[in-house]
């Protein structure tokens, strides 16, 4: 089964995204920080088909997480964040994000 990895420190948003993913008959795993997200990616590397990644997290920001992901993995990454500056979007895309969406 394809797995979507959600990495975001907002627990309510994670629960909502997980529910939406599972309604599409996909599996979802949730990490509430960057380090946990990298660990879960390693555990699910054979089934992970998408990563939804926040930028602002306490232990490791999403840009750092994305750099680590791209060292070993080409799984598609969707950055979903409240950071709406054009500079942040460009940084995310240059680091290898497949898309960059801002939260309302």
What are these regions (language model features)?
Residues 11-29:
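Two-component/phosphorelay signaling modules centered on CheY-like receiver
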Residues 30, 59-60, 86, 94:
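Residue-level signal for the "D+5" position in two-component response regulator receiver
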Residues 30-50:
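Acidic, metal-coordinating helix/loop segments flanking the phosphotransfer/catalytic sites
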Residues 33-36, 61-64, 69, 88:
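Acidic catalytic/metal-coordinating carboxylates
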Residues 42-46, 68-75, 95:
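Conserved phosphotransfer cores of two-component systems
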Residues 55-57:
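Receiver (REC) domain active-site loop signature in two-component systems and cognate sites
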